[in-house]
Amino acid sequence: MSTAAASARSALADADSALLRAEGVSKRFGGLQALAEVGLRIATGQIYGLIGPNGAGKTTFFNVITGLYTPDSGTFVLDGRPYEPTAVHEVAAAGIARTFQNIRLFGEMTALENVMVGRHVRTRCGAWAAMLRPPAQRREEAEIRARATQLLEYVGIARYADFPSRTLSYGDQRRLEIARALATDPKLLALDEPAAGMNATEKVSLRGLLEHIRDDGRTILLIEHDVKLVMGLCDRVTVLDYGKVIAEGLPADVQRDKAVIEAYLGAGHD
């Protein structure tokens, strides 16, 4: 990704075209202040990185914006509207989909069926229709299957459509999780360490997929420990340490930040 391209997308955020704005987000667990007045602004069409040492609060922030944790304080605006993360299914309906650090697929279901499950958040027919199977429900089910097939092709694993998801390679399971998240038609795709456990070749392939998703107009929030991947892929980066924001900006600027080097990158980073 060129510096000019990253700067252009960052300028969008400065022009208040933010898809997601979070301000003053705090979360405490007993005596542990997991998040302290965290704020960030993600522009539409960006890949936005959230990095920091282990225990910095990254996954806690993900869990807050996706309804798994209730924040003690803070406000959110999603796509120009006030947003309150509540139940997980309501978060998906609002337009945020996520993956987890640990893969969470239905192992005995096929790859296609896993993606179809994700698509059901956008269905119009209710439970009675699912049982009675009127023509409208059957048409919708066919549409769901077709869309799921398209998404498997999109992420590059269509040949495994009928395979149980547990039989896929680790990297392909990660791609399947992304396809399932995309099936909800999210405004914001939140990925929690998607490159964890991948080899170098798989990481290069993942980077290409995420760039493709962004270039198709999706917005991505990314937690990732692979600093090289983050700095080469993201348009902007926020760094957390002990639940606080210690730096935010273009990747090149963040890499030179003294507080970031001391807390996370290490003195030997270049």
PLM feature spans:
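Glycine-rich phosphate-binding loops of nucleotide-dependent enzymes
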Residues: 2-270
